[in-house]
Amino acid sequence: DPGVIWLAKKHCPSVPLHLSTQAHSVNGAAVAFWREAGVERINLARELGFKQIRALAEAFPGVDFEVFVHGAMCLALSGHCLLSAWVNNRPANQGRCTQPCRFEYRGLSLLVEEQKRSGEALWEIREGEAFSGFWAPQDLCLLRYVGCLADLGVRALKLEGRTKSGGYVAQIADVYRTALDRHARREAGGPDCG
């Protein structure tokens, strides 16, 4: 919320501001806007690929970028899913997502067609007695690419942890820290970052 950023800068000008992934920063105009507003670290949207991250890092060399590298991928645009608010009255855009896309559902029979293609099923779900997480996207794991991100100028890596145990967070943080240290020592094992 630009208003919150403005108030924070007005009342606490010495506090560094970090922008959440929920701001969905996906392009140079957004980065320029938030930078001009006084944001020091911008967490880029999870949906960006290496080419987009590289372009932003090259266009804005003084910006401290953070990239989400490990955890759940959102069914919608990151942080903008309404399913959690609808199912559990816990809005994702307030950091309270219950990840209902990961719940197991049973679609007894569902055919979806688009108005202009009547009679042509675009999406079909048919299941028996079992339940499944058919809405859940595959988790994000960019461990192999942390060196590439570091070389692009990404200054911080974001790991999912809000809904995880302390032990899980410690283990994942250690794995990524080790990968970054190996990259800093230029040990072999990383992919071609193209």
Which residue stretches match the model-derived regions?
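As written
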Residues: 38-39
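Conserved nucleotide-cofactor-binding alpha/beta core module
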Residues: 28-29
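Active-site pocket-lining/capping segments in soluble small-molecule metabolic enzymes
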Residues: 2-25, 43-44, 52-156, 163-194
